[in-house]
Structures are given as C-alpha cells and as structure tokens.
From Swiss-Prot:
Belongs to the GDA1/CD39 NTPase family. It comes from Mus musculus (Mouse). Disulfide bonds join 271-302, 362-376. The lineage of its organism: Eukaryota, Metazoa, Chordata, Craniata, Vertebrata. It catalyses: a ribonucleoside 5'-diphosphate + H2O = a ribonucleoside 5'-phosphate + phosphate + H(+); GDP + H2O = GMP + phosphate + H(+); UDP + H2O = UMP + phosphate + H(+); IDP + H2O = IMP + phosphate + H(+). Keywords: Calcium, Disulfide bond, Endoplasmic reticulum, Glycoprotein, Hydrolase, Magnesium, Secreted, Signal. Its EC number is 3.6.1.6. The active site is at 171 (proton acceptor). Hydrolyzes nucleoside diphosphates with a preference for GDP, IDP and UDP compared to ADP and CDP. In the lumen of the endoplasmic reticulum, hydrolyzes UDP that acts as an end-product feedback inhibitor of the UDP-Glc:glycoprotein glucosyltransferases. UMP can be transported back by an UDP-sugar antiporter to the cytosol where it is consumed to regenerate UDP-glucose. Therefore, it positively regulates protein reglucosylation by clearing UDP from the ER lumen and by promoting the regeneration of UDP-glucose. This is Ectonucleoside triphosphate diphosphohydrolase 5.
Length: 427
C-alpha cells in the first residue's frame, strides 16, 4: 500500500513512548496522542526497514520495526535498534573490501533483530554522507560497489539504488521532518516548527521553516525547497555546507586542507596545548599536529584562527536570531563532554554557553591533562560557526538532543519512511 507523504509520516508520531525495545512507559504529546492509541500487545502485522548511515566518522545501522493492526490502516512505529562501528567507510579509501566488511558486521545486528521469516521482504539501504562526498568519485564508487555486493549476498530485499551518496540538502530536510514530527510540531493547523542544526564530521546542515517574507526574498537561489504534507506546502530554508563539519574544520584551522603534502610536516595551532605532538587520521590520511611551541595560546588567538574558516563563508538569514532550534550530533557530543548538558538527557543551552565553555577550556590549556586535545578547537569552532557563520545571537536557545522520544535524531528515520513509501511496503 503506497501512501502519501502525509500518511507516511503519521507513522512517526503514533507510538513512540511505549515500545518493544525501550523501557520507558510514558504518554507523549498529552492531549494530542494518547498511549492507548499504540497497538502494543495486540495481534498485528509487523514489518521492518534497515537504514545504514555511512558518515565520515562511523557507520551506523538503524533497524526500525513497524506494526499494522488491520489492512488499510496506517502502520505505527514500534521501535528502533541502533548500533555503530568506527571508523567510517572513508577511512578505507584504499581498502574498499575492508570497508565493506564493517557493513557486514552491522548487518548481523539486523539478522539478530528481525525474524528470519521477514528477511526477504525487509529492504536494506545505505546512504553515505559528507565523508564520501569529499573522496575522489572513483574511490567513493569503489567503496559503494563493495557494499552493494554485501547487500546482494544478504537475505534482505535490495531495491534499486540501495547504496548511494545522499545529497546534503536532502539530509537536512529529512532530519527536520523527523524532529518536527517526533516533537509533535506538525499536527495542528498552525506551523509552529523548530529548526534543526546537524554538525557532522565533514559537513553541517541548517534547516528551518521561514516565517517572514523577507527571509524568502533575501535567500540565495538553491537554499529554499518545497514539499507537500498534510495538504499543506512547506517551503524550507535548508543548506548543507561541505567541509564545515567538525573534523573537516580542524583541518582547515590547522591549514592542512591547503597543504600539498603531509609527510614530515607538523601542523600547529594556538588552539592546542603547547607541549602537544601527536598524530591524527581522518579520511584515510595521517596528519601530524601540535601546539605552538612559541607564540600565543588560548581562546583569543584560537578564535582568530577559527574565524578565518567561517567568516564570510556561510549565509546568515536574519530570522534565525529569534528562532528555536534543535541541535544534535557534534553539538550534542561536545556539550555533553564538557558537562554543559546531561549525556543521557541533553538539555537547553544559549549560544553564549558554548563560548563561555570554550574560554574556560582554551585559557587553561597549560594544565590540560585528559580528554580530546582538540576540545578547545572544537568548542571554539562551534562558537564561531553559530555566531559568525550562521549569525545566531548570544542569547539564542538551542535544544541539544540525541534522541526524541527514544528515537535517534537525524535523517535516518525520515529516509526509511520515504523508502517504504517508494516500495509500497506494509505488512
């Protein structure tokens, strides 16, 4: 039964609080959806979807379970199994078979999670993001072909185009849709939505629904996209900035992106402890890096280095200064690493909180003893990206989250529903 976008995404909301895979028993969206709506512990048709997220820093598998009570009725999202491996496929740029073996490892998770009787009708798809976008096309395709062979030799349903590199803007749209449906923002007649900020290793995305005509008029061509849902048309501002992910920004800050070679050269920064001499591998390339043995060190000189990476490089829609945004991925991780938020629960921060923590970490590099040596640089980059890149105000509130109602944030769930819609799959 192929369904419309509106029907498909109704699946996301209806039954997230009480699931097979998560223990929390709670009524979500009180007054809108009740826990009694969830078809748990009933005789129901069950079907599954497998979505691989091949990011720059790791490969993740999402196994979603859906139930359908009766034919002709919309199915419900019942739960998610999530696992991951590191490093990402791009680290195997010259060993594509080894890269594909990491996917095979995760595919065993799907076999363990899905009954054998459902294997041949469960679709499996891998979508690669910025890590593979940055590779030479021939090398990226070699990796994808090896993964495709793994899929073809699996017991699962392998649709056409099952292994591909996803467009960055599409990534942002699906993450926005997922978050806003899981938070119940798109279920009334109004359009009280939240924006989304995703910071990966190699790219970053910003997506929101503009409320002011001025934003639509002043936005560059290619930053706006429309889609229809619930008999409404949503015109989103969305853009993916390749090379502005957290780890790609480290290379840019160190000056390693412009370097013709890395052998024998140590890249230095005021964002690193003065005594530091270390190696770092990203995208299959090994870099030597260290602190400034002579010269300045701390937040101010670090900020000056990072500012060169972002200033004047990103579009700044004025509207974001007063908008509500959900932020995840490395925004969440670095906030949790520095105790700005609870690691499990997340929390709400102001943009200025990232700057405060960056100053605290960077101005104490002399006593740095544990954790990531890049912590000062990462926090400073996040601060500069939000303020000088996107143009957020110091007081702009950000909801930092890893999961919404026990489901991973990001684009994977939205992509799975789109996949099921295109294949016409129900129970």
């Amino acid at each position: 039964m192929a369904t419309s976008w509106g029907a498909v995404f109704m699946l996301i909301i209806a039954c997230v609080g009480s699931t097979v895979f998560y223990r929390e028993q709670q009524t979500w969206f009180e007054g809108v959806f009740l826990s009694s709506m969830c078809p748990i512990n009933v005789s129901a048709g069950t079907f599954y979807g497998i979505m691989f997220d091949a990011g720059s820093t790791g490969t993740r598998i999402h196994v979603y379970t859906f139930v359908q009570k009766t034919a002709g009725q919309l199915p419900f999202l019942e739960g998610e199994i999530f696992d991951s491996v590191k490093p990402g496929l791009s680290a195997f740029v010259d060993q594509p078979k080894q890269g594909a073996e990491t996917v095979q490892e995760l595919l065993e998770v799907a076999k363990d999670s899905i009954p054998r009787s459902h294997w041949e009708r469960t679709p499996v798809v891998l979508k690669a993001t910025a890590g593979l976008r940055l590779l030479p096309e021939q090398k990226a395709q070699a990796l994808l072909l090896e993964v495709e062979e793994i899929f073809k030799n699996s017991p699962f349903l392998v649709p056409d185009g099952s292994v591909s590199i996803m467009d960055g803007s599409y990534e942002g749209i699906l993450a926005w849709v997922t978050v806003n449906f899981l938070t119940g923002q798109l279920h009334g007649r109004g359009q009280e939505t939240v924006g989304t900020l995703d910071l990966g290793g190699a790219s970053t995305q910003i997506t929101f629904l503009p409320q002011f005509e001025k934003t639509l008029e002043q936005t560059p061509r290619g930053y706006l996209t429309s889609f229809e849902m619930f008999n409404s048309t949503f015109k989103l501002y969305t853009h993916s900035y390749l090379g502005f992910g957290l780890k790609a920004a480290r290379l840019a800050t160190l000056g390693a992106l412009e370097a013709k070679g890395t052998d024998g050269h140590t890249f230095r920064s005021a964002c690193l402890p003065r005594w530091l001499e270390a190696e770092w591998i990203f995208g299959g390339v090994k870099y030597q890096y260290g602190g400034n043995q002579e010269g300045e060190m701390g937040f101010e000189p670090c900020y000056a280095e990072v500012l060169r990476v972002v200033q004047g490089k990103l579009h700044q829609p004025e509207e974001v200064r007063g908008s509500a945004f959900y932020a995840f991925s490395y925004y969440y991780d670095r906030a949790a690493d520095t105790h700005l938020i609870d690691y499990e629960k997340g929390g709400v921060l102001k943009v200025e909180d990232f700057e405060r923590k960056a100053r605290e970490v960077c101005d104490n590099l002399g006593s740095f003893s544990s954790g990531s040596p890049f912590l000062c640089m990462d926090l400073t980059y996040i601060t500069a990206l939000l303020k000088d890149g996107f143009g957020f105000a110091d007081g702009t509130l950000l909801q930092l989250t890893k999961k919404v109602n026990n489901i991973e944030t990001g684009w994977a769930l939205g992509a799975t529903f789109h996949l099921l819609q295109s294949l016409g799959i129900t129970s």
